[in-house]
Amino acid sequence: MSKISLDALNVRNALIEKGIETPMIDPTQAKNERRESIAKHMHEVMKLIGLDLRDDSLEETPNRLAKMFIDEIFSGMDYANFPKMTKIKNQMKVSEMVQVNDITLTSTCEHHFVTIDGKVCVAYYPKDWVIGLSKINRIVSFFAQRPQVQERLTEQLLTAFQTILETDDVAVYVKATHFCVKARGIRDTNSYTVTYAYGGVFLEDRDTRKEFLATVQK
């Protein structure tokens, strides 16, 4: 079993404490066994749909789906995959807002297992620690790689960054298109969903919040 880092454990415990962890169970099978089982079941699902898996274009699709689920689009369900964090002591006494805009978001709607496509913006006021900018993108990617609802994802990101950075002063903005709306049902190709989560000074001070929103809503 892969080792889970202390940062990952702290984040997971914080999410559980707040009641915003993704509904998950601990798997009892090894990854290769789970891939084999998923492939077997997907083979039957595809047959029930009416597809002929003897066709060379389709015969490996169950295996491809199993690998994609376990190793790629749902890899964020395994905290062993949580990004390795190197926190840097804030020796320069950075006190201004640190903000990363337009982080690519590609996730999966947990209701229909179709794509959520959008952008994330994260900002924080450093206290004792800062982290490398790419780590912000990696944390967003980790939580995107699991079945999600946008509202919970936004809150998970807020709590994760607050936990790692050891500060409440964090803001998260998510703007996304949901293919469960775009590609099925109402088939609305124009609408998008925006969610926000604020902590600390972003929650308490309107001007700070406005400063953050002024850049993300351009």
Swiss-Prot record:
Classification via Pfam families: GTP_cyclohydroI
Enzyme Commission number(s): 3.5.4.16
Presence of keyword Hydrolase: yes
Principal EC category: hydrolase
GO process terms (BP): one-carbon metabolic process; tetrahydrobiopterin biosynthetic process; tetrahydrofolate biosynthetic process
UniProt similarity note: Belongs to the GTP cyclohydrolase I family.
CDD domains according to UniProt: GTP_cyclohydro1
Record's protein name: GTP cyclohydrolase 1
Top-level taxonomy: Bacteria, Pseudomonadati, Pseudomonadota, Gammaproteobacteria, Pasteurellales
Keywords: GTP-binding, Hydrolase, Metal-binding, Nucleotide-binding, One-carbon metabolism, Zinc
HAMAP family: FolE (MF_00223)
Name of encoding gene: folE
Catalytic activity: GTP + H2O = 7,8-dihydroneopterin 3'-triphosphate + formate + H(+)
Pathway: Cofactor biosynthesis; 7,8-dihydroneopterin triphosphate biosynthesis; 7,8-dihydroneopterin triphosphate from GTP: step 1/1
Superkingdom of source: Bacteria
Matching InterPro entries: GTP-CH-I_C/QueF, GTP-CH-I_N, GTP_CycHdrlase_I, GTP_CycHdrlase_I_CS, GTP_CycHdrlase_I_dom
Quaternary organization: Toroid-shaped homodecamer, composed of two pentamers of five dimers.
GO molecular function: GTP binding; GTP cyclohydrolase I activity; zinc ion binding
Binding residues annotated for Zn(2+), in chain numbering: C109, H112, C180
GO CC annotation terms, alphabetical: cytoplasm
